[in-house]
Structure formats: C-alpha cells, structure tokens
Design a protein with these regions (language model features):
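Structured, beta-strand-rich domain cores
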Residues: 1-52
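SsDNA-processing nucleotidyl-transfer enzymes
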Residues: 1-22, 133-146, 150, 166, ...
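Short, flexible loop/turn elements at secondary-structure junctions
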Residues: 39-41, 52, 67, 155, ...
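C-terminal accessory nucleic-acid interaction domains of nucleic acid-metabolism proteins
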Residues: 57-59, 67, 71-76, 80-98, ...
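Short beta-strand
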Residues: 196-198, 305-311, 352-356
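Short, conserved phosphate-binding/catalytic loop or strand-edge motifs used
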Residues: 309-319
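Catalytic palm subdomain of template-directed nucleic-acid polymerases
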Residues: 318-331
C-alpha cells in the first residue's frame, strides 16, 4: 500500500499487550512503555524509551528487546524485509502500482479486512513451470511463482508402487504439491504447521518435525511461539504459497498437519474435529457405521460439518467453529456427541486410551481438540504405497459401496476435484 507518499507493507502480524499495570498511554507520556509482542517475526518483551531531544528539538525514542527466551542474538530486522502477508518487500510493492492501496478509491475495493477474512485464491504453477520441473535432472534450481527453489534427489523413490504398479518419486511429489496448492493452501494459510517427514521414503521410519530449519528460505513465513516451554518448538512454518508448499515436498515433509487455530489467535479453534480411529480388528464397514451415526447426530443437532477419508483406514469429520469458543469448549462438545454415538453401538467402540487395551475396537477420538493437536490436512499424502491422499467427501458418499479410505492418490485426486469439487471448501473462513 501507499501512505503519505511512501510504500507500506504488513511487515509483521500478531498481538501486543501492555506488560505493566496502568494505562499504556500514560506510560508513553512518561517515556517508558513495556509491552509484549506475539508476532510472526517479533516476539517477547520490548521497551520503548524516550531519550533526550536532538539538536532540532525533536523527540528521540529507543526500542529495546529484553534478553528473554524470545531474544535471538544478532537478529536484524533489516535482514527480514518481506511482508508476512504477501511475501513482498517495500521495493517490490513500489514497483507494482497495481498492488498499491489508494486512498482515493472506494473503501469497498480494499483487499484485506481486519480479523479473520477468507483465505486468498491461489493460482497453481504454469504449464511452462511444470515443463521446467520435468526437464530438470536429478536436481537443480526450479523457478515457480516468482521464487527459486533448489531441488535435490528428484528421482528418489519416496512411495512404493500402489495399485497402478508405479512407484512415486520425489519429483512427482514436488509436482503434486505445486498443482494441488490452490485446493490445499486454504487449509494451511495462517496456521502453524506440524510435518511428518520421510526423507528416505515412506518404507523407512519417519519422524515429526516442527521447528523451521536454519536452511529454510528467507521468504518462508514463520511464527514464533512465545509460550513454548524449554525444549518445545519455538518457530513454526506457515505455508501460504505455491513455492512454500513445493519447498515442503523437497524437504521430505510428506504428511502435513496444520493447527486448527489461526494466527494470531492460536487459542481459538476454527475447527472441531471428530476422528473415527479404527482398531486392529475394525473393518471399514465398522468405520462407516460410526460415521453415519455422526451424520444422523449432527443432522439432529442442526450442525454443519463434512466427512473426510483419511487416506489410510479411518474417517474424520471437520466442523467449522465460530468465534468465542475455546479448545475446552470444542473438546467437551465433541466428547458429548461421541459418547452418544458410541453408546449406540458399544460393540464397535472402546474408550480406552492405550491401543493395546482397546481389544481391537475403534476409538472415537475427541482429544485432538486442543492447541497444537492436529489431524492430517485435506489433500495431504499419507505414508503408504501409491501415495494415497486424505480427501473430503459428501455425506451421501458414505453410502457409496465403492468408497475406500485410500480410494484417491496423488495421481487421481485432481480428476476427483475436477468432477466433484471440494465439499469442505465452503466451510473455510
């Protein structure tokens, strides 16, 4: 945007709070304001101090970062010039006048509203960009949507062959993440991300990875969790672009789990999650019986939600939550509904926490409704042969005799979307 003849970006995004008792305006008048920031770039305790006036009589202020757990030695804001919203620098905004906000235009043309607005609409890679990816050797630099990505080991097999008899390479996963981005990014946008990495392929042990690595590109959006205890993750990736999603693929993050809360209000859930988690003796027919009972219960309650096959053995149900509810609220509500469903067919359900005590029965898991508890994101691959994908479905598809939890893969889900769309998409935002 433009303000007073200069270009302006949203350099950081988050919340602030006065750190001392009393009126913050009075603290400013007294020249000593202590406050806490919880932003995507700046976090921790800050002090704004008034110094002596300069020779012209103008006030001088000094901004200090206290030496707390959020302080990073040598961190220079000048080395992080990009907007947390657009990824652009001031110079790039100034060079793109069509992206500027104009005070002489109607307010109705503003592109960003305060609060949680619906996510933007993303365009996938061009045919030329995809052709360039296909033409790379085992590795190289790929330019996509204005960013350069250094890709490695593109011919490495990451998924064994599935029903079609063809294994899935890293190149194909990078390509999939890029082309699925317009469908997947709305579920990742403005949310901290937990990733399940399989850098050596899904037939080798994977591991959870949450902390942004030091070699991540500067333009990858990040969120600093100032509430993290020692030893916990402090810096999370926030995937909000086609290049960021493709970078995750190259990083070996083959399974993506976004938080159910959005920045900056990480304590306020936007989804309530129901997870029909099958036991060792549960059949998919058992899972469908339970999912249909949830369908009946939600219809009776007048609650809107959408089921999603997990890409492995289960079914999840995602329910949008309005403002004003806590994780305790959503967890208690999902537990109440789940116990009503479970008591209808007690022969299918166990309430035991440990899997080895469930006698092979399904668990109706309501405990994922908590901060930093996640379920696999829509359209994320799952670690199984053929690279199956977690896909939202319509309620009536629970009655489809051909439905399987791993029915769609990275090679078939785009045809599914072209034919049926995403039934969960209208509930985002």
């Amino acid at each position: 945007g433009e303000y007073g003849g200069g270009d302006v970006i949203v350099w950081d995004w988050g919340t602030w709070s006065h750190a001392k008792p009393g009126d913050p305006l009075k603290a400013i008048e007294e020249g000593d304001l202590h406050f806490d920031l919880q932003g995507q770039k700046l976090a921790g305790r800050f002090v704004l101090v008034r110094r002596d006036r300069d020779t012209s009589g103008k006030e001088q202020w000094l901004l200090l970062h206290k030496n707390d757990d959020s302080a990073v030695p040598g961190w220079d804001p000048e080395e992080h010039p990009r907007s947390v919203k657009t990824g652009l620098t001031n110079d790039e905004v100034a060079a793109a006048p069509e992206a500027l906000w104009r005070s002489d235009l109607p307010a109705g043309e503003a592109s960003v509203a305060l609060g949680h607005s619906p996510p933007p609409v993303w365009e996938g890679p061009t045919e030329e960009e995809l052709a360039a990816l296909d033409a790379l050797g085992k590795g190289g630099t790929w330019e996509v949507r204005g960013r350069e990505l250094k890709l490695t080991n593109l011919d490495k097999v990451l998924f064994p062959a599935g029903d079609d008899g063809r294994p899935v390479t890293k190149r194909e996963i990078v390509r999939y993440y890029a082309v699925i981005a317009p469908w997947m990014l709305p579920y990742l946008y403005d949310r901290p991300l937990n990733t399940h990495r399989y850098p050596n392929g899904v037939d080798k042990p994977g591991f959870w990875h949450k902390e942004v690595p030091s070699h991540a590109p500067e333009w990858l959006q990040q969120w600093h969790n100032t509430e993290a205890d020692p030893g916990e993750t402090r810096c999370y990736a926030v995937v909000d672009s086609v290049p960021a999603l493709a970078w995750m693929a190259n990083f070996g993050a083959l399974e993506l789990h976004a938080w159910t809360s959005r920045l900056p209000g990480v304590h306020q859930p936007t989804w309530a999650l129901i997870d029909v988690d099958p036991g060792t003796t549960s059949t998919f027919d058992d899972v469908l019986v339970l999912a249909r009972l949830y369908r009946t219960a939600l219809e009776h309650l007048g609650v809107v939600g959408t089921p999603k096959v997990t890409g492995q053995r289960g079914v999840q149900i995602w329910i949008p939550i309005g403002e004003g509810y806590s994780f305790s609220d959503t967890r208690a509500w999902v537990e109440k509904v789940s116990r009503a469903v479970g008591h209808t067919v007690p022969e299918l359900v166990s309430w035991q926490w440990h899997k080895d005590r469930r006698e092979g029965l399904a668990r109706l898991d309501y405990t994922q409704n908590a901060i930093n508890k996640t379920l696999v994101a829509p359209f994320s691959p799952r670690p199984a042969p053929g690279a199956p994908v977690s896909v939202p479905i319509r309620w009536d598809e629970l009655d489809d005799p051909d439905l399987r939890p791993d029915r769609w893969t990275i090679r078939t889900v785009l045809d599914r979307l072209a034919a049926a769309g995403d039934p969960l998409a209208p509930l985002i935002g």
